[in-house]
Structure formats: structure tokens, C-alpha cells
Amino acid sequence: MTNCEKDEEFVCISCVEEVRYSFVSHLSEALRRKGINNVVVDVDIDDLLFKESQAKIEKAGVSVMVLPGNCDPSEVWLDKFAKVLECQRNNKDQAVVSVLYGDSLLRDQWLSELDFRGLSRIHQSRKECSDSILVEEIVRDVYETHFYVGRIGIYSKLLEIENMVNKQPIGIRCVGIWGMPGIGKTTLAKAVFDQMSSAFDASCFIEDYDKSIHEKGLYCLLEEQLLPGNDATIMKLSSLRDRLNSKRVLVVLDDVRNALVGESFLEGFDWLGPGSLIIITSRDKQVFCLCGINQIYEVQGLNEKEARQLFLLSASIKEDMGEQNLQELSVRVINYANGNPLAISVYGRELKGKKKLSEMETAFLKLKRRPPFKIVDAFKSTYDTLSDNEKNIFLDIACFFQGENVNYVIQLLEGCGFFPHVEIDVLVDKCLVTISENRVWLHKLTQDIGREIINGETVQIERRRRLWEPWSIKYLLEYNEHKANGEPKTTFKRAQGSEEIEGLFLDTSNLRFDLQPSAFKNMLNLRLLKIYCSNPEVHPVINFPTGSLHSLPNELRLLHWENYPLKSLPQNFDPRHLVEINMPYSQLQKLWGGTKNLEMLRTIRLCHSHHLVDIDDLLKAENLEVIDLQGCTRLQNFPAAGRLLRLRVVNLSGCIKIKSVLEIPPNIEKLHLQGTGILALPVSTVKPNHRELVNFLTEIPGLSEELERLTSLLESNSSCQDLGKLICLELKDCSCLQSLPNMANLDLNVLDLSGCSSLNSIQGFPRFLKQLYLGGTAIREVPQLPQSLEILNAHGSCLRSLPNMANLEFLKVLDLSGCSELETIQGFPRNLKELYFAGTTLREVPQLPLSLEVLNAHGSDSEKLPMHYKFNNFFDLSQQVVNDFLLKTLTYVKHIPRGYTQELINKAPTFSFSAPSHTNQNATFDLQSGSSVMTRLNHSWRNTLVGFGMLVEVAFPEDYCDATDVGISCVCRWSNKEGRSCRIERKFHCWAPWQVVPKVRKDHTFVFSDVNMRPSTGEGNDPDIWAGLVVFEFFPINQQTKCLNDRFTVRRCGVRVINVATGNTSLENIALVLSLDPVEVSGYEVLRVSYDDLQEMDKVLFLYIASLFNDEDVDFVAPLIAGIDLDVSSGLKVLADVSLISVSSNGEIVMHSLQRQMGKEILHGQSMLLSDCESSMTENLSDVPKKKKKHSESRVKKVVSIPAIDEGDLWTWRKYGQKDILGSRFPRGYYRCAYKFTHGCKATKQVQRSETDSNMLAITYLSEHNHPRPTKRKALADSTRSTSSSIC
């Protein structure tokens, strides 16, 4: 071990004597338990001894300073702690961790006296945090962040291993550590060994176990590792093991690849004493099984934070290269490495020393194309242990089947003569392949290394076994015509030697070329052929100039060719090995002439082949499982498929010329016949286990009794005896159906007759019916309803009356909306939850049940308020009725009984009410004009606050019809104790998306409440959070959550607090409840009082921000207004303390609409802002350019290309957005002129790297600047002058 390595593993703790034998002793012991050596230096010793100790501090890899937070920093302490910091600045490799222990009253004094610049965050003891938790935080920080780069992300995994060990019964405990190459198995095992080895009588860590046992032998390894320093020679292996039989032994076998070799060492663990621990690391899961280890820990990759930290440390990247660009680069590297520590660190070291970001990006692209040897070697060592078949399957997946359905891959590979069920499991066990959501996945690194193995076989493209790169395939297949002596000659040299090719996948998205007629002639071993277009917006242009294809390889298992340009496949092609034919959008008229052997064919997809007329040859494919002929519009016949016993899926949808199907396959599972001309279908062959047909048929004679589901049947000639097992009968939109037989003896659960406009009567309902749909029928009266009914939907029907439903205890949903002839209802079920009868002419409504949650109507006398009330366009409702419902709503959401709060939050978080507005609701509910309202929270509500109830009055335009699309966005803003702006945004629909809402003809009032809407900054219920006001702003939105235009306005609004009540909530106390401390206050009055109490210079700063700098960065604003002697930092704090502004977490100044409005009103009402600033503003007024009218502005577009290292165009720009562009590797940045708010400049530009040359930038300028180009020195000064003058 080198001295450097020793220094890295050494930690020095500096402290005062007061904490040395208490807190610091626990910290020192905790570090030792993690295998970290440490010493403690007392700063209270005299200068001579401290000078000697200073040498230890300088050599330490990490220095921990424990500062006594409850003691005044004396000069002696400060001097010695400053020397500790000086050691760190002299030794750049040393890290310093600071701890402020004790009360934090003197924290600021310590921080001001010592210079902590460039150091990590300071750990501080807290009242709510015990010393043990603080020690745990410090140890983790030292262990991962500072101790040594290789252990980043190890700490949490180490705790999981410890937990796995501790859960095992006393005896010999075993743990297997499993993971892909480079994931950190060895590092984790070393960390476990360092931490636990001191607790055992003997321990050994055998690195690269297979190699070690091969070189030294089993006997020497045991003696050397477990009995070090033993002078006597032990002649027998049994004697050596006898000496260890009574000892607690820790054995770590690292990177075991041969399970038999590992098992020979352990031999059933009989020779180990009780309490011993065996740890094996391996990338092959079968090793653990054969070694008898059942507890297996799978090592996961680093999370995003850990991965970024490791990358920046490995690359020695400094933040001065630009934080945004560094963020983008590190994210790309991390995403590519997918948390693999080896890959992240190797890529980081490869990028180390690159000074320019463009150099780093270029180097990274090269590394992706050609992975570093260290990474390739780590993965290839696993690849070399595979059998030939396993290697072929791995390479097929790496090159062709990433993300494909595992059953699809297995089917193709079985056709190739492999045994993929077994061999894919082997690849999974060796961490080369994963199966997730029934799809096959490879780590991006693993895929690229697999492809690198292919490319490394030979430099000749035609000699490679698998091809996937479009440019190389084009080179091999392209038709080249040269004219010599007036005669065309075609060269085929490129195709020679291509006998080795087994797979060819060509993406034609960006290609345009002609294929050789004999392109595939020499590819005798080609198994997999796929020519496709990954971009659906691009039409591929690949043709045969001679109009023919001479041959296809007879070894093909997969033939996937989209937009195949010829009328048939080559006649000499023998498809006996084909497993799948997938040729959508082809020009095929028929597959081939004559009879072919199709015994291996499982799937054929010829969808949207509009010229296809003949598929009779498919009858020869006796093992066929899927036929997809969707959209084959010229296909007239579908052959009798009764002998295709394995056929499961047939899709003939869109085959408009097919009029009949002679036979249905006996084992059919899905039959798609939408858009066909089929009028009749024989179902006598349908088996009991295939119970679903998806079709659009007009007649099915002779329904089988096993059939359980039919969709869109128009006529049924079957008797009820044939429908004994039918459970779902959907006759939706069967407009010709006039009657149905008595169905009382059927076992139907669902009966859908909606849209059967000619059906005017029904004789009886099935006794077990649960769902009944009668919407749009002509039925006027219905027989007795079954007691099992759960849903009754008669929307828009001709019903005049209903039987008494009081005994239907299972009925939950009743929809009678639009039943214009319905006059009376005798009673409602007691468990009813949803009731809709808007648009009816009911004379009398019975008592509503207490269980009701949703009501879309009016007239409830229930004391139990539903969750949703809708009184849309009920203008005849009296004002008192509307006010009563509003009061009920507010009462229900304002006071929630104690003990039920959490249940309501989980089960019923929202409530709503809507009704036409009345003019004097303002007086009743203290509504404020406008779309904003300020709320002051009573101190007593802080511990009982649940959420808010909101009243919003919306004005609708007269010609607006689709009110269903309208919703309200509520933005709640407040300031935390640090003056930072916090916000919650929730969106409420005025009407549910499925509700049919007529044209709204008047302003409506909506009540929304959400008990999940509770302001919080993640800091608990700290009272300082509520020191200011809470502001609510409301915006009309559509279903896409976009703001509606000015024709939709929020006229008035108000807010109520929802809290946990402790008293009676009955309606008799409603007046008392609402008279408690009014929640709404006059926003303008509160703001004006706060403004009037400001100092004059703070008033000026507020007016500047209100006029110019809302939503701008503090760092941007400060230099612009520094020229008029305003103290920005202290002024912003003053404004934030009185709730006139807020500062967001990313440093933006935030004002809500009420604050901006008041500022502008004050500004316009004053003839001067401040006498001290009058001369400055008047002097600069002439510098402000006059604004041009909008209609005279011209939008100018100019595109230029410049090198990425160019200094720019000398204009001052601010970036305001960035987004990924479809089909481009690089994102596009959006910039606006920095003088937009001072000069009204409309100039913008868009910047994107060139696709052909990443070192070039394509810049698109939109509109011209309306001011002179500033010099570098004058840019900021000009901005300041124009800002100060434009406020006047």
C-alpha cells in the first residue's frame, strides 16, 4: 500500500476538551466500526504539542473539526482551528468536515470568524436530532463523500448487508453478493470485510478466487489466509481445519466464477465454528445455488446523486465550465452508464483533462462507439464463459432484440435451433440480460460491448455475422451502375464473401438508395432479415431498379420487410424454415406461386397491403397461430381455416370485400371483423374456453350455449335456452331491435340496450343482473327491477315512471338525466351514492339518502351533504336555496369531526358545488372582486389546519356551448420563514369530463375544497412559515390545463379555512361558525398599510420591482439598480418580511397580481417617485427608445452558422428555455434580449448544435433589436440607465 493510500484511510478529529470524551469519543468509535482509522487532536493543548499534532492533521486524508456551538469562540481556539483549515488549503487532496455541536445560538459567530469557503456543508446538532443520529450523518458523509471515491454509494448497501446477516439464525451465516460486472461487488465485499473482520477470530479475503486457487492451491490458501504468521507447518488439511473448527471465521471469496471450485473450498461449511460468516461475490447466480447460499443480495447501481458525484470526482471537473452544460453532460454519461460505478469512473477518467466542453462531448461520443478496454474486458470475461449457443443468443439480443417481447424472441430463437428457455435463463443468471415486464433488456453498456464483439471479429463488413448499422448495410446492398461502352454493368464485389452474415436489421429512416437484384444471393446463412422504418413520418425510398429480386436465403426464420416494393416474393425462395412473415404496407398481390412448405410458420402479418388478393397458401401452415390482414382492402376471400388447430388470433378488420367466413378455427381466441362485409358467422365450432368475439356482425344464427360475450349484435334468432351461460349481452345502438324475449331465467350480469331506439318494451330482467343500460331507448315503463342491480343508466330515455327502488340495497348509481318525460320517483335506495336527474321535469323529489356523494340536480332536504352538487342553469332556484346549499357546503368542509380527518383525506379529499350566481352573495360570503384574494391565518388554526374551501364566480361568454371543458386552476402562494416564495397549484373541473352540460347562460358560482391542499415547505408545522399572508389566485382553464382567453373571467372569489373542529357542527350553529374571525381581508388595504410603513428607499425598490423585475433573478436585478444607491439585499429582505414580495428557491423575485397591481397604481398616481432620485431619472429619460406600435413591427428571420467556441455576437442575451427536438441529437436553446424589459426589445434567437458537425452552432435570429449594440464595458451600464428611466 502506498503512502497516499494510507493517508486516504486516515481521519483526524480536532476538538476542544469539553466534547472530547463525550460526543467525539462516540464519533471516533463509529468511524472505527466502519473500518476507518482515526486520531483525536485536542486544540486545548499548548502550542508546542499542537504543533506536533499538526503534522498528523496535514497527513490525514480527512480532517473533522468539532466546534463547540455553545461556547464563545476564543482567540486560542480560532487560531488553532484556522490552522486546521490552512492544512486543507495546502493539501488539496484533503477534505474537511465541520461539525457545530451544541446549541446553535453562537453558530453565526463561529461561521463569521472562520473561513469555510470551498468546504462541505456543516453538520449541526439539532434539538429534534439525537447525538447518535448526528454521528450517523457525519460517518456517512466521511465514508462516502470524502473518505474515498470508490466507496460512493456503498454506505447504504453496507447497512442492507448487515441487516441481511443479522436476520439469519445463529450458526454459520452465508450471504451472496450478485451483480453485473463493474457494479461494485468487490468494493462492497471489502467494505463489509473492513467493518466486520475485527469481530472474528480469523478472517480472510481472497481476491479473484478462481485465479488464486489455481495458482496457490486449496491447502496453501487456507494456511496463508486463515493462519497467518503460523511458524509450525501443518502437514494435513484435516488438521488445519480442526484448528479452525472452534473459531468464528469470516471468509470472503471474491469473484467466484466456477461454482465447483468455490464449493470445494467450503465443503458444506462443516469445518467452520458457530457464528462464522461466509460471503461470496459472483456475477453468476448459479454459483450461490451450488455453494448452498440462499441469501443473495443483488447490487443495484448508483442513484443519480451518487453517480453525478462519482463522475465529477473521476473527471476532476470544476464548476467554472458552466453549470448548465456540465449538468447536461453529466446526465448523458450517467444515463448511459445507468449507475454502473466502473463505467462512470472510467468515463470520468477518460474525460479528465479536457478543458473545453466540446472536447469532452466529442470524446464521450467516441467512447460510446468504442468502449474503453477496461470495461470491455470486464464484460467479455463473462461472455467467454458462455457456450456457443448462449453466445449466439446473447449477440442476437444485443444486436436485434433489445426491448422486444420475450415470447416473441423465444419463438424466433427456437426456430433457429436454439433452446432459448434455458439459455436466456443462463444469460439472466450471469447478469447479461434482464427480463422486465415480459420484455428482454440489456444494460446499454452490455449492448454496446456485445456489438463491439461483433465489430471486432473482422474489419470487413461483409465478413461480420450481424449487421445493424444503416451505412454499412447500404454499402453492402446498394445497386451501383456504371456505363462502359454504352452498356450498363453492375458490380457485385461487395456482396461476395457475405456467406457469414446471420442477421441484418436495416432502419431506412434516413436512407434513399436502390437495392441490387442479387443483394441476398450469397447470404446463405442469413437467419434474421428486417427492413423497417423507425420514423413513421418518413416514407422510405428503397427500390429495385430492375423490378425484380433474384433470391432470398432459404435459412430465413424472420422475414420482416415494411413497404416491400414488389408484387411477390422470389419464386425460388424456400420458406420451410420461416417462423414469421411481417410485411405491412407492401405491394404484394400474392406471396408466391405454387405450393410451399410452411410447417414452421407461426405468424403472418400483411396488414395494409392494399394490393393483396390471394392468401390461399396459408392453409398449408398447419402450425400458424396469428393471421393479421387488417386493411387489405382488395382481399375478397378468407380460406376455410377449420384445420388450423393452433390458430388463436385472426384480424380481418378493414377487409371491406370479405363477405363471409366459411369456417372458424376451433381454438380461436380473438376474431376481429370490424369494417368487413360479413353478415353471418357460424359459431357452432366455438369452444367453451374461448368466450370472447370482437366483431360488428348483423346476425348470428344458432348461438352456442357456451358463448359468454357478444358485442354489437343487431338481431338474435336464438331462444333463451341457447344462452344459458351468457353473462354479458351488449346490444348497443341496435336501432332495428324492437323486442326481446323474457330473460328472467338467464344468468346475465350486464345488459346494455343503450341506443336501441326502436325497443319500446321489455318483458323481464335476469335475476342476477348487476348493470342495466337503457339510455336512448323508447321504453316507457319497466318491470320490477332485480335486487342485485348495482347500476341503472336510463340517460335520455322515454321513461315516464319507475317502480319503487327503496328495496334495491345494492344500487349505487342511478342516472335519469335527460328523461324529459319522467314525472315521479317513488323512492331512492338507501345506499345510493350517485344520482343524476338534471334536465328532468320531476314534480316532486323524495327524500335523498344519507349515503349520497354525488348529486347532479336540485331539491335535497337531506342534512347529510353529498360531495358534489350541480345546479347548472337552474335559474328558478331562489336565492335562499342557493345560499343554503353554499352554507351547507362550507359547513361540511369547514369543520371535519375530530377522529375522521385522516379517513376523509384518504377517501374523500375534494368537494364541489355549482349554481347560478346571485348579486348579493358578496355580502353573505365576503367575496372579493377580481381573481385574487389574500388570507390571513389565525394563530389558533395552525395546529388544526386541514385545507381550504374556495368560492369562485365565473363569467361565461354568451356564445360558449361546451362548458364541460371549463375548469379552475388555483395557485396558493406564501412565504416561508426565510422569505422564500412557496406555492401549491391544484386544478378543479367545474363539471366532470363525462357529464353532459348544456350551454351556460349566466354567471355561475363554484365551491371547491381540497383537504390535501395544505401549504407546507417540508419543514413541519413551524409557526414561522405562517408569519405572512397566504395569497390565492384563480385562472379559468380547459381540460388540457391551458388558460382560457379573456372571455372567461373570474369576477369574484373567496376562501374559507378547513380545520379540525372540536364542537358541534349541526346546522343550528351555522351562523356562529361563519361569524368566527373572517378569513378574507381586503388585499389592497393590507398591502397599502405594509407599503406605507416602509422607508422611502424601500418604497422605491418595491416600485421598481412591481414595474420591471417580477420573476427576475436577484443576481440579475442587483447590478441593474445599483446605480441609484438602492441596497438590494437588505431591501429585498424588508419587502419579503412584510409580504410585499417573495423570493423563490431558485432566486427569482415573485409578486402576485395584487402586489403588482398596487405597485402600478401607486406609480401612476405619483408625479415623482422620490426627490433624491428625481434628477437621476430625468437625466436618463431621454435614453429610453420610443416604443413602436405592434402592427409596425416586422418579424425578421436570419440563420447563421458559427463555431461553437466563438465568443458570440456581442449582444446581451438571457436564456429562457430549452427543449429536445424530434429527430435531433441535440436540444435547442431559446434566448431573448436582456433589454426586453428595459427597452421593450423583442429580439430572440434559437441556438442548436449542427447535426453534421457538432462543433458548429446553428443560430436563428427572430426579429431585430430596437437599440444599438452595446459594448462589453457598457452593456451593464446601458441596462441600468434604461431600467431606471423607463420606470418613469
UniProtKB/Swiss-Prot annotation:
Residues 5-146 form the TIR domain. ATP binds at G179, M180, P181, G182, I183, G184, K185, T186. This is Disease resistance protein RRS1. The keyword Iron does not apply. Residues 25-26 are annotated as: Important for interaction with RPS4. InterPro entries: Apaf_helical, Disease_R_plants, Leu-rich_rpt_3, LRR_dom_sf, NB-ARC, P-loop_NTPase, TIR_dom, Toll_tir_struct_dom_sf. LRR repeats lie at residues 498-522, 535-553, 554-575, 577-598, 621-646, 665-688, 697-720, 740-764, 766-791, 792-807, 808-829, 830-852. It comes from Arabidopsis thaliana (Mouse-ear cress). One of its GO terms (biological process) is defense response. It is found in: Nucleus; Cytoplasm.
